[in-house]
């Protein structure tokens, strides 16, 4: 609904950049993440289709897809179980909200003729096999 409200003004002004936050889970599944992954796959496809619909305008659309990021996500996922949520990040160095903000700042600061369609971002401790996490010995 936010896009629907703000997009007409962007088109009229002939400037703007819509940044959607997806997830690498929208491209690669993980156990127990079926609904979350499906919604993030939608965000990616919505972003791609919106950019296609805006072809011929200078409006940019980007989908930023973080991997493991230490946010309230795990706390919500585990119904408020703080100990279980903390174990997700134990021994790893996940992305932070500041890291994602820095990426958004960079993407939106590029010259106006450049559009980053989608960007997968993971901490170096994470890989695609499937979302394997290397943990340091504690």
Where are these regions (language model features)?
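Active-site helix of classical SDR
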Residues: 3, 39
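A short helix-coil junction within the Rossmann-fold of NAD(P)-dependent oxidoreductases
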Residues: 5-14
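Alpha-helical segment proximal to the catalytic Tyr-Lys
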Residues: 8, 48, 52-55
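A short hydrophobic alpha-helix cap/turn motif
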Residues: 11-12, 54-56, 69
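Residue(s) in the substrate-gating loop at a strand-loop-helix junction
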Residues: 23
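Active-site loop immediately N-terminal to the catalytic Tyr-X3-Lys motif
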Residues: 28-34
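C-terminal helical subdomain
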Residues: 63-67, 83-130
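Short, flexible catalytic-loop segment of classical short-chain dehydrogenase/reductase
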Residues: 66-76
């Amino acid at each position: 609904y936010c896009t629907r409200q703000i997009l007409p003004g962007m088109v009229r002004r002939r400037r703007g950049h819509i940044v959607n936050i997806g997830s690498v889970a929208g491209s690669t599944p993980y156990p127990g993440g079926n609904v979350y992954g499906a919604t993030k796959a939608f965000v990616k496809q919505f972003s791609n289709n919106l950019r296609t619909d805006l072809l011929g305008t200078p409006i940019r659309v980007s989908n930023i897809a973080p991997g493991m990021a230490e946010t309230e996500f795990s706390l919500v996922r585990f119904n408020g179980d703080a100990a279980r949520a903390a174990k997700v990040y134990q021994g790893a160095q996940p992305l932070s909200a500041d890291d994602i903000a820095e990426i958004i700042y960079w993407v939106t600061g590029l010259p106006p003729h450049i559009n980053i369609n989608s960007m997968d971002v993971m901490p170096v401790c994470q890989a695609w096999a499937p979302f394997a996490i290397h943990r340091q010995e504690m």
